[in-house]
Amino acid sequence: MSVGAGDPVRTLYRTLLAYGAFGILILVAGVAEYVHFEPFTTSATLHAKVVGVYAYDPAGKQTSGADRERFARNEDFAAVVDWSGLPDNITVEAVWFDSFENIVGSVGPGTPSRLRDQTIVTAEAPKGLKYHLPGQYIFAIERLDNGGRPVEVIGRRVVYVER
């Protein structure tokens, strides 16, 4: 049995080949873009040191106890940052995010030397609430560009507020 010139299978086959070639082209372009913007030979050279996350006394404005990863809703907590390991030619800020990605505490932006006296970054309960919302809280130290936009996370900690 011979295949005629008007066979619909040939058109479908060629269409599938065209879609496959287009898919491979998109994949190659994506890999090329990834290699260009994320070269394998370089890695992030800046790393900020988060000393720890501790219970916080708002009256005395001090941290206490051991470094922890879990807190109760009614406990105040804060991160302690060591700014001394960062060069002074960058702009940084330290930010607390709650489970809804709301900013619940921050220090900066500024150069590390300007922030040297602000080593304690507290996580505040949301406005109108007495306690922290339960869930995951992320503390991030970010490097900012000249426009004040975060371009790199150079330090990070995650803590959990339990119900």
Predicted regions and their residues:
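N-terminal Lys/Arg-rich, disordered targeting/topogenic segments
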Residues: M1-Y13
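Hydrophobic membrane-insertion alpha-helices, especially the h-region
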Residues: T15-E33
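Short, compositionally biased P/S/T/A/G/V-rich stretches that sit at domain boundaries
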Residues: Y34-D76, E162-R163
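Short edge beta-strand/loop segments characteristic of extracellular beta-sandwich folds
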Residues: D76-S84
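Short beta-strand elements
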Residues: W83, R149-R163
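Conserved aromatic beta-strand anchor motif in extracellular beta-sandwich/beta-rich domains
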Residues: A94-D98, I141-R143
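Solvent-exposed serine/threonine-rich low-complexity stretches and specific carbohydrate-binding patches
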Residues: V104-D117, G155-V158
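Short, solvent-exposed, Trp/other aromatic-anchored flexible loops in extracytoplasmic proteins
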Residues: P112-G147
